[in-house]
């Protein structure tokens, strides 16, 4: 595999691969969920879509929302973690997987607006379109999707019931987002990186060639310390505080939703301290939370102890069940 793409490709698929290793599965009596695709937002000629997986019947059911990762630059709603989908099948939950407009053609404020609009659509249309019980919603996501999951707890109204963030981050303006990274492989030339983006607004990278090229763009941003500026359009050093409203760690209040976080201590893509910083602020505000730490695990829990990885994944599913049964 081309090393210029490898890191971001791993960012997008590591969660799915990690969750594929669990022994849980469908039973003989589990009926498959019914999949439909919906446009939840239109901006000009760009349609932003969501895939809905729902159980048969008209009874209102709780909702699990999945937000994909990919550095806010690549990824797709089609990247669905098997284990979470299996949970929804067994428990007869509605499962909702979101696309959103990708950077750098749009910036983080627009991406955040897509997340808000997705939940507005879910509350307004979900009950009649797919029998969603919008009083019970758990939001889940990995890496950049974990960031947007955390952000949803601060910007979505009404607030979700609970959140599950896999190796996410609570800030987008910290030094780690603006520093040159030594962990992203062979240097990607600027001209090559820029040639991969800027042609049109995308809501997913289902085209493998497109995803690969944009992966190179992400690697270039991390190698040069330009990632935060590239995806937000705001220079955090020149305009300190301007990104605060889009940094979940700076928006926690006592009514922030309960959250479970999973993170490896050797994560070289999203530092482990991103989750410990969140945990500290959550504790300060008295918010219920759990941080499951995987010693020695890389991004996506690569190199983590298989038993501990399985235990963490199982606890995440249990947390989802607990939260959706609580109301």
Regions found by a protein language model. Name each.
Residues 261-263, 267:
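Short beta-strand/loop motif that positions the catalytic acidic residue
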Residues 60-70:
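Short beta-strand element of the alpha/beta-hydrolase
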Residues 308-327:
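Catalytic active-site module of serine/aspartate enzymes centered on a nucleophile-bearing elbow/loop
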Residues 164-250:
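Accessory cap/linker subdomain of secreted extracellular hydrolases
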Residues 28-58, 112:
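N-terminal cap/lid segment of alpha/beta-hydrolase-fold proteins
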Residues 117-193, 243:
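Primarily recognizes the serine-hydrolase "nucleophile elbow" in alpha/beta-hydrolase
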Residues 78-96:
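Short amphipathic alpha-helix adjacent to the substrate-entry channel of hydrolases
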Residues 74-84, 109, 273-274:
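The serine-hydrolase catalytic nucleophile loop
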